[in-house]
């Protein structure tokens, strides 16, 4: 499903005039020669070079420039692991909405959560995310491992009771990533190529789109001959929104944000402001939960903890 979506996006970009070259890999990058220079390797082993006035790295989890230019830095997040698959879901629960993503929290270990993303063809992407230590003692068979987590979570088990598990599960570990810098001479990093926080709330999509929009605006001015400052006009404002997301991701795993989300007497206007952030408006400084995320979330969590549920 994701491959079909990615190909659709790529085809639409090609229709707009973008030159997309499949089956080729960037194996070297030189940004010290005035103009960025890339060395490309084709599937048959032949190589060629491409130079440019500027490079934008949108390679996502491939993180091409961070790897080639030694820009990778350790993430501050604990090492977490995801195990996931696609199933023929056969969901017949009356309350299940196929137009929405279902996020489920483990009933006793709140830092374990599941996603269920229904597709239009009767299939669903199902996955679990947990800290590495929660996998200790579980089956090394990924299908059995995933289903053991689901079996411990009755609400999700009911949703997937009729599922046909016909696709081998896969795993991804230590996916959170960071970099030493978001830009350098002749290049800037976009989206997950720069920093990936966590799959919860799908912040990666928002950060990818926002970083691309911001970088394109700065680069356009630079190519027009203006003097620009990539640090103050791109890196710092981008980081403010990323740090807002970081606050809510950290709060999710700590349980404080879950206290807010799951509180039965939540105020509609507060839900709207928080939902706005998760929908992508993490740079809207008029929203108090953006301008002061840590203080506001802590205050709200304290209120939820003292009010009767």
Please give the residue ranges for each predicted region.
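Generic detector of well-ordered alpha-helical packing
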Residues: 7, 58-59, 193, 199
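Predominantly flavin-linked oxidoreductase catalytic cores and closely associated redox partners
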Residues: 11-156, 160
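Short secondary-structure transition/capping segments
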Residues: 70-73, 126-135, 202-206, 265-284
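FAD/FMN-dependent oxidoreductases across multiple families
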Residues: 134-218, 224-235
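Short, function-defining helix-loop hinge/capping sites that tune catalysis or transport
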Residues: 65-68, 200, 206, 248
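FAD-dependent flavoprotein oxygenase/oxidase catalytic domain
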Residues: 109-110, 122, 128-133, 142, ...
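Active-site-adjacent segment of FAD-dependent monooxygenases/related oxidoreductases
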Residues: 1-4
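C-terminal helical "tail/cap" subdomain of flavin- and related membrane-associated enzymes
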Residues: 217-309
């Amino acid at each position: 499903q994701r491959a079909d979506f990615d190909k659709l996006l790529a085809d639409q970009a090609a229709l707009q005039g973008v030159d997309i070259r499949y089956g080729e890999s960037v194996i070297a990058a030189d940004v010290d020669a005035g103009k960025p220079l890339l060395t490309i390797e084709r599937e048959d082993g032949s190589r060629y070079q491409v130079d440019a006035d500027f490079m934008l790295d949108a390679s996502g989890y491939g993180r091409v420039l961070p790897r080639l230019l030694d820009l990778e830095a350790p993430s501050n997040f604990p090492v977490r692991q995801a195990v996931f698959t696609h199933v023929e879901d056969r969901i017949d629960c009356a309350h299940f909405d196929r137009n929405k993503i279902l996020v489920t929290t483990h009933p006793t270990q709140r830092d374990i959560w599941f996603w269920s993303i229904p597709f239009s063809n009767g299939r669903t992407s199902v996955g679990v995310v947990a800290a590495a230590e929660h996998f200790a003692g579980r089956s090394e068979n990924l299908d059995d491992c995933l289903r053991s987590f689901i079996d411990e979570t009755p609400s999700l088990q009911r949703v997937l009771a009729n599922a046909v598990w016909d696709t081998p599960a896969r795993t991804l570990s230590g996916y959170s990533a960071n970099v030493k810098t978001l830009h350098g001479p002749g290049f800037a990093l976009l989206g997950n190529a720069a920093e990936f926080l966590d799959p919860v709330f799908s912040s990666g999509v928002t950060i990818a789109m926002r970083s691309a929009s911001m970088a394109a605006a700065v680069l356009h001015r630079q190519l027009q001959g203006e003097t620009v400052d990539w640090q103050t006009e791109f890196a710092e404002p981008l980081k403010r929104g990323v740090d807002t997301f970081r606050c809510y991701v950290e709060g999710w795993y700590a349980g404080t944000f879950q206290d807010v989300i799951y509180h039965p007497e939540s105020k509609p206007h507060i839900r709207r402001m928080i939902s706005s952030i998760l929908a992508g408006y993490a740079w809207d400084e008029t929203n108090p939960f953006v301008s002061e995320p840590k203080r506001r979330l802590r205050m709200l969590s304290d209120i939820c903890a003292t009010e009767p549920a």
